[in-house]
């Protein structure tokens, strides 16, 4: 992941050691923004329960996976094929944070939770919350590939 810093007028690569740091002062991490890991490729999934349209799935990292979390518990709305909650555990199996998804809307062939709220569980951050609200989504947008270059970071930062 790359970041342009206007103050020093430089584009820097964010090293792996910084991927767990806060993204723009929020409760999200840099890793959350790039989703380096793939749940399907990096985790073993086990169905814990199914009640009506809600399934609870436990995700345990595969032995060779370079992932951040020791375990993730996901509740999924089966009917709409969207997450309801994700509970993240560290490598000591301590519950670290909970993300909730709400306001599911249909956009073309996609069902999308338009609100994501991340709540850290650390005692020093108990009152923190970061909410992301999608006002509009477009899955068919035509985006010029040049937008995804390091040069574009500087060009669009002002």
What residue spans do the PLM features occupy?
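An acidic-aromatic
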Residues: 1-28
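Generic alpha-helical secondary structure signal
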Residues: 8, 32, 47, 93, ...
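Residue-level detector of beta-propeller blades
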Residues: 11-13, 47, 83, 95
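Gly/Pro-enriched, hydrophobic low-complexity segments
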Residues: 21, 31-34, 52-148
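A surface/extracellular/periplasmic glyco- and lipid-processing/surface-interacting theme
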Residues: 25-32, 40
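Short, low-complexity, Pro/Ser/Thr/Gly-rich segments in the mature regions of secreted, periplasmic
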Residues: 144-158
């Amino acid at each position: 992941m790359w970041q342009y810093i206007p103050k020093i007028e430089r584009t820097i690569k964010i090293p792996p050691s910084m991927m767990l740091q806060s993204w723009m002062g929020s409760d999200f991490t840099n890793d959350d923004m790039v989703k380096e890991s793939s749940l399907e490729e990096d985790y073993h999934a086990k169905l814990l329960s199914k009640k009506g349209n809600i399934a609870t799935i436990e995700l345990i990292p595969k032995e060779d996976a370079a992932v951040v979390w020791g375990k993730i518990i996901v509740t999924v709305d089966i009917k709409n094929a969207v997450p309801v909650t994700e509970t993240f555990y560290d490598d000591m199996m301590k519950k670290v944070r909970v993300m909730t998804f709400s306001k599911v809307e249909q956009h073309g062939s996609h069902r999308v939770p338009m609100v994501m709220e991340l709540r850290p569980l650390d005692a020093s951050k108990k009152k923190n919350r970061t909410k992301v609200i999608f006002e509009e989504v477009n899955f068919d947008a035509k985006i010029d590939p040049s937008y995804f270059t390091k040069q574009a970071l500087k060009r669009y930062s002002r």
